[in-house]
């Protein structure tokens, strides 16, 4: 069970994350504040204000990892922590995540190219370096194909998701990321009323 917290205040995120873990959550994802992907630096320290999410900082990572370890002891299982390693500081955030014991990173340059107008060469180089780091640190990466379908029809544009999955797989392999650490993005976003919709989704996922 994958649960998202995003209050903007890391200390309030901790309360929500621990409550979610007690209710059965396996992975806690802390969404980043709006616009952090366009910051050319990583903010410092614990943060208590964000917009639509919480700043990704090394201290925030440490606070949340500690909180999940505490609740993990309480419930008798390990709780994974996920954050976002995309935008203009992919390698820096990858290093922070490796140092602070994160388990999963959303790690995809293509989203930044398509939706944030980030320079393609720069961000693909950044992605390569961040995936080398994630691979070495044992961090699982997720890619962001589900984002493409927020502005397009999931049937008509299914080929774009598939193409991106194949590109992301090859870029991850080139960076030395083991296959067991690859989480290629897919989301069930076809209209539930579509005839054979589930078969289409299943076929694409396979």
Where are the predicted features?
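Anaerobic metallocofactor- and corrinoid-dependent redox/one-carbon enzyme cores
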Residues: 1-206
């Amino acid at each position: 069970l994958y649960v998202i917290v995003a209050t903007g205040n890391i200390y309030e995120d901790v309360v929500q994350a621990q409550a979610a873990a007690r209710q059965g959550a396996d992975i806690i994802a802390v969404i980043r504040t709006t616009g952090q992907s366009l910051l050319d630096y990583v903010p410092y320290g614990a943060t208590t204000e964000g917009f639509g999410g919480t700043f990704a900082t090394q201290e925030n990572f440490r606070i949340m990892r500690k909180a999940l370890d505490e609740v993990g002891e309480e419930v008798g299982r390990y709780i994974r922590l996920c954050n976002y390693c995309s935008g203009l500081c992919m390698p820096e955030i990858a290093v922070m995540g490796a140092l602070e014991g994160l388990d999963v990173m959303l790690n995809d340059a293509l989203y930044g190219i398509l939706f944030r107008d980030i320079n393609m060469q720069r961000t693909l180089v950044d992605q390569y370096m961040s995936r080398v780091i994630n691979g070495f640190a044992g961090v699982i990466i997720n890619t962001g194909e589900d984002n493409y379908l927020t502005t397009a029809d999931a049937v008509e544009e299914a080929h774009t998701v598939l193409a991106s999955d194949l590109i992301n797989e090859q870029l991850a392999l080139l960076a030395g990321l083991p296959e067991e650490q690859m989480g290629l993005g897919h989301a069930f976003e076809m209209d539930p009323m579509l005839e054979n919709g589930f078969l289409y989704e299943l076929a694409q996922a396979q």
